[in-house]
Amino acid sequence: RGRDDDDEENPRDPREQYRQCQEYCRRQGQGQRQQQQCQIRCEERLEEDQRSQEERERRRGRDVDDQNPRDPEQRYEQCQQQCERQRRGQEQTLCRRRCEQRRQQEERERQRGRDRQDPQQQYHRCQRRCQIQEQSPERQRQCQQRCERQYKEQQGRERGPEASPRRESRGREEEQQRHNPYYFHSQSIRSRHESEEGEVKYLERFTERTELLRGIENYRVVILDANPNTSMLPHHKDAESVAVVTRGRATLTLVSQETRESFNLECGDVIRVPAGATVYVINQDSNERLEMVKLLQPVNNPGQFREYYAAGAKSPDQSYLRVFSNDILVAALNTPRDRLERFFDQQEQREGVIIRASQEKLRALSQHAMSAGQRPWGRRSSGGPISLKSESPSYSNQFGQFFEACPEEHRQLQEMDVLVNYAEIKRGAMMVPHYNSKATVVVYVVEGTGRYEMACPHVSSQSYEGQGRREQEEEESTGRFQKVTARLARGDIFVIPAGHPIAITASQNENLRLLGFDINGENNQRDFLAGQNNIINQLEREAKELSFNMPREEIEEIFESQMESYFVPTERQSRRGQGRDHPLASILDFAFF
């Protein structure tokens, strides 16, 4: 049986899950590298589960639960009182002893939590992660540089204002980011299927974060991360999906009643996976990890989907075949019962849905696969992969490139009405303020660091606490824009609602690469507010003067002074222009750009 929202509806104790995770790592008996990687995942899962637990309590409007008070001493006292009321004699003594043991365990875990918050500890853990997860020396170097920057920023915050002149402004920005309803930190993407060979991660339902995203509530994001020389077990989903390879190479096979299609996929390739099609993916590369990012559109329940595995692993109920009674299976498969039992028992010896495979088997699975450009057409065909790299860039200059695959040109994308785009912003450059006419864009940070600023009329000025307002309240606040901002790093996700002006910048030391899914992408128009091709320049003279209450010449001096289009450097190229006290500065004040 597939898993999706079970943990959200019936949350388990994060500490107990952490203990089980550590026990699982010890049982594996793998080498030191695998043990370290497993332990790091346990620690990350604990931190994420604790944050999720706090978020659930915050949404329910209760900071303190009377049945389970947060204060450890109150919990201990409550435990002792329950022992007095409900136990007698020897049972009461054992009950009190368990209360004491629980208090000691919580104290040890609090101490470990304090260690995890220590910047030095975080820095060493970050460095270990780089050594384990990144294969190439160049990626390891970039990862370690990010660790160093984060460590220095943390030190600057703790040293006080004298060591960080911009500390107060940075603090406000970090507070805003924590409450940003459109931003999802990489650590908030939960692992649903995890083993030593990889994991499948789901982003929470968009409406779990905020009702502002109810327009895309029937879409989900899933990320596959697989080690070299691995295969994912065959399965199908009750969801349409579009998948993009963001790292490594893959061979993906689709099986339906009439057809079987295999495709070799490179980084930047896009493929549609129809609902109900049995699919399996292999990573036959011996060195590089595989990462695939998928946008799903469930077909049964809005925002909810399941994965259905024919072959189970670890847990007997993971295979849908196991739920059928023996007499049904014996008759349907024409196979004796004892042979079926051996068949199912053999599957339970594996751990997880991503498994290691021999080079011989992997070569056999990929030898008849087609590549992008070889597109089969049939009633149940996926249409084959699309290579974003082979598309001509929609926007390009020395500061960045933007590629896109449109539903108008690719039949594979029409059913979900999704446009897929890939942007690379060079270090120290910006994709200028722009907005989408009808598409809401879900963006995944493939690589690099940067930040974005977005103008939004739906959030309040107080740490975005008004994000769930009713429609009437939203209408009353029309025209009152607030800046929504976040710092971006690899693995983060953010959403750009239709009509919202946004600017995205890359950091000074590395390029920023972004993958975008434009929902309602057919015939979407992208309008730019700066650069040579901005829409302000197309306004009539009288419209400009009436709008900005200034002479046309001064307005045009501002909007025509940028020599580049779409992507520009963040450093000023010209000495022309005015300071913030110039009257025309109000043009961009509405969006805080």
Curated annotation (Swiss-Prot):
Sites where the protein binds Cu cation: Y182, C456, H458, H500
Query: Cupin type-1 domain location, by residue?
Result: 187-341, 386-556
* Alphabetized InterPro entries for the sequence: Cupin_1, RmlC-like_jellyroll, RmlC_Cupin_sf, Seed_Storage-Functional, Vicilin_N
Name the residues that span the membrane.
none
Which SUPFAM superfamilies does the UniProt entry name for this protein? Answer: RmlC-like cupins
Per UniProt, the keywords (alphabetical) are: Allergen, Coiled coil, Copper, Glycoprotein, Metal-binding, Seed storage protein, Storage protein
Q: How is it modified after translation?
A: Proteolytically cleaved.
Q: What Gene3D superfamilies does the record tag this protein with? A: 6.10.250.890, Jelly Rolls
Compositional bias (Basic and acidic residues) at which positions? 46-76, 97-118, 150-178
- Domain of life according to the entry: Eukaryota
Q: Which residues form a coiled coil?
A: 529-556
Which residues lie within the region annotated IgE-binding?
49-58, 76-85, 101-110, 463-470, 541-555
Q: What Pfam families does the record point to?
A: Cupin_1 (PF00190), Vicilin_N (PF04702)
SMART domains from the entry? Cupin_1
Where do the segments described as T-cell epitope lie? 175-193, 206-225, 246-265, 302-321, 318-337, 382-401, 414-433, 438-457, 478-497, 542-561, 558-577
Specify whether Zinc is a keyword of the entry: no
Give the record's glycosylation annotations as residue positions.
N229
Single GO term (MF) = copper ion binding
**Which tissue types show expression of this protein?**
Expressed in seed (at protein level).
Positions of region (IgE-binding. Involved in cross-reactivity with peanut allergen Ara h 2): 140-149
Which PANTHER family does this chain map to? OS03G0336100 PROTEIN-RELATED, VICILIN C72
Q: Which family does it belong to?
A: Belongs to the 7S seed storage protein family.
According to its UniProt entry, the function of this protein is described as: Seed storage protein.
What this protein is called in its record is Vicilin Jug r 2.0101
Q: Which organism is it from?
A: Juglans regia (English walnut)
Taxonomically, what lineage is the organism?
Eukaryota, Viridiplantae, Streptophyta, Embryophyta, Tracheophyta
